[in-house]
Amino acid sequence: SDVRIIVESLSKINKLELTSDEEEKAIYLRKVMVGLSEDVRVLYIKLACRLHNMRTNWAIKPLNQKKKAMETESVLIPIAHRLGINSIKSELENLCLYYTKPDVYNDILEKLNKSRDELNSNLENMKKELSNLLKENGINFEIKGRVKSVYSIYKKLATGRKWSDIYDILALRIFVEKESDCYLVIGLVHSKFRPVPKRFKDYIANPKGNMYQSLHTSVFGDNGDLYEIQVRTYEMDE
């Protein structure tokens, strides 16, 4: 039965020693884990279990906390990425950073919290401007906005950028009904707001390896802040 296959696959995966500092071994372990999963639901269950474990990671010994975080980072997060489960991937990334580099995590979080009210205000203003623009052009849509995660900002800092040089920490996602509307929305956005050169990415015509589809761009708002904007259909987001 399906249940028996899932239970047996999970049992095999749970016996694996997943911790590895070596990239080659981590890649091998990911392949083994995928190979042991006769049903993709096994990987979803494993990721859900690991997310629960990481959320309660504080309850175990510090040495084991870091070991579990490193294991998650090298083996399980790439699998979440491959499956396109971005919500789990993002939360795991933040939790892993918290347990592997707590000082870095807390420093970024403290800086974010100091400017959070201003960031949220700017985000809401941009949402209103975009909403008015799309309504004026008769487009059915939904907009969601967010301040980027601690891990996302950490990755930018890791490239050598200074905190004062990081402007693109505000992101908006626009959902529309048809693929043609995605391109129409991008055209309207670029006509009203100045786009950042070389930041437009068409993942609809050229999907990512995990079949992720969306249009990405970055624009300057009227206040000079930088906003990352993603446009996709509801179907592409499923």
Q: How should these model regions be labeled?
A:
Residues 1-11, 85:
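Hydrophobic or amphipathic alpha-helical targeting/insertion segments
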Residues 15-43, 50-238:
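Nucleic-acid processing machinery
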